[in-house]
Amino acid sequence: MKFQSFFSSVLIFFTTSTLLLSIPHPVSANRSNQSSFLQCLSLQLNDSNIVSKVIHTPNDTSFSSVLASSIQNQRFSAPDVPKPVLILTPVQPSDVQSAVKCARRFGIHIRTRSGGHDYEGLSYVTHKPFVILDLRNLRSITVDVDNRSVWVQTGATIGELYYEIGKKNRTLAFPAGVCPTVGVGGHFSGGGYGTLLRKHGLAADHVIDARVVDARGRILERREMGEDFFWAIRGGGGSSFCVVLSWKIGLINVPSTVTVFNVTKFSEQSALKIIHRWQFVADKVSDDLFIRVMLQRYKNMVRASFPGLYLGSVKNLLKMVNKEFPELGLEEDDCTEMSWIESVIWFAELGEEPINVLTKRTRASLAFKAKSDFVQEPMPKTAISKLWRRLQEPEAEHAQLIFTPFGGKMSEIADYETPFPHRKGNIYEIQYLNYWRGDVKEKYMRWVERVYDDMSEFVAKSPRGAYINLRDLDLGMYVGVKRSKYEEGKSWGVKYFKNNFERLVRVKTSVDPSDFFCDEQSIPPFTFVEVI
């Protein structure tokens, strides 16, 4: 009786709610499909306790908090941003299977969310009726120290992953990003990089198995899915092909002592000299050394920061930098020795907290827009100076430019080994970011566009590359033109994936020919023509 009562209450929502009437779509057909979907899902779950934990309708008190909890870009929390008709929070893998099977049967559009860090909000926003599949409850992490491997569910964050590794062993690590609240689901499936990329490459380079739910609702591991499918989800964006439930990753060794450091400059002349020289050094120096460049405003001044990680002692670091990069002016007082897991906290700017600070899930308070580029030839000082002046503009109060060095392991892995193609020949990647508070966004977004335009002659061309994990809808998206999605998707797909785009399309055509898993920039199948 309890289950039937709960099911009746949620079904009544779908048959009577005026919320759905405000969404422009064929109302009667979609409402019928949504009710049928809910009935299908509720019957498959078949337990009132599970149903109440998994299904959240707009009438539920939990709906708003669940929706908002993983919105990491406040640009997509405004009242006029489309909201889902339903949020599902699976508590076990079979719940995901049920959701996919029922959604496919009744034509329900699903968006899958892990940590909510999609830069354009595509894991939780679209302009047609949709359901969010939020994987927050699938976050178990099993560390096998003896075999140097981990099974991690995709609702976990990289901070939680780092914490579990650090608890077990201080000389094992994983080469993923620096922001601890990023979900491992999207991060690994887009490539994923951090301070260890020059020594060990991308996170995706160390994925050795995966469990997914495919478009037919089957749970598959690497052996069952095949090597092409497995290749595609390690850098090609998993949400185009399946729902990734968990990853098996291989851990890497790090020294018991590493060194972090930071050098800051406020003088434009001093900063430009160092940045210009950095371009000739950062990708060629020992792969034990990672030095990032960050440009941003600080108390109405432009500040250049050079934070870095060295896999070794301060003594050896200073010896190397004084020889290879004396322009940096690195001194012993700029450096601190610590364990690798402590360096993760340092780069995340979390202070001197215990390592369990990495498990905290915080919600971003600012809106932002971002773009990315890859640089293959050193920029002249005039170009760097132009960036400095852009940061002095009023709209750049919270802007940030991040230069991430490549080389090392990144140059040793062929560009076709995973879908991420930006390997050998790239000196560094630039990320252009601008943050703001409030609803007035146009001037801040235009600032990013101006900077991006300024850099056009100094970055990779044919195509001008971009990183899928720094998603940018300005590159293009499906707009409903009556031509093949392949022709539309290729225009931006080659920017993210270069020659690997064609192989991704072949995989998509094989594993999801009806395009069940899709979004505004998803990989298209060859066979599918539709108005989105």
Curated annotation (Swiss-Prot):
A Pfam family it matches: FAD_binding_4
The entry's keywords: Cell wall, Disulfide bond, FAD, Flavoprotein, Glycoprotein, Nucleotide-binding, Oxidoreductase, Secreted, Signal
Crosslink site: 6-(S-cysteinyl)-8alpha-(pros-histidyl)-FAD (His-Cys): 117-179
Co-factor binding details: Binds 1 FAD per subunit in a bicovalent manner.
Main location (coarse class): secreted
Cofactor: FAD
Modification after translation: The FAD cofactor is bound via a bicovalent 6-S-cysteinyl, 8alpha-N1-histidyl FAD linkage.
Residues bearing glycans: 30, 33, 46, 59, 147, 169, 262
GO cellular component, one term: plant-type cell wall
Domain of life of the organism encoding this protein: Eukaryota
Disulfide bonds: 40-102
Location(s), subcellular: Secreted, Cell wall
A single MF term (Gene Ontology): oxidoreductase activity
Endpoints of the signal sequence: 1-29
Ranges in coiled-coil conformation: none
Enzyme Commission code(s) on record: 1.1.1.-
Protein name, entry field: Berberine bridge enzyme-like 18
Annotated organism of origin: Arabidopsis thaliana
Species classification: Eukaryota, Viridiplantae, Streptophyta, Embryophyta, Tracheophyta
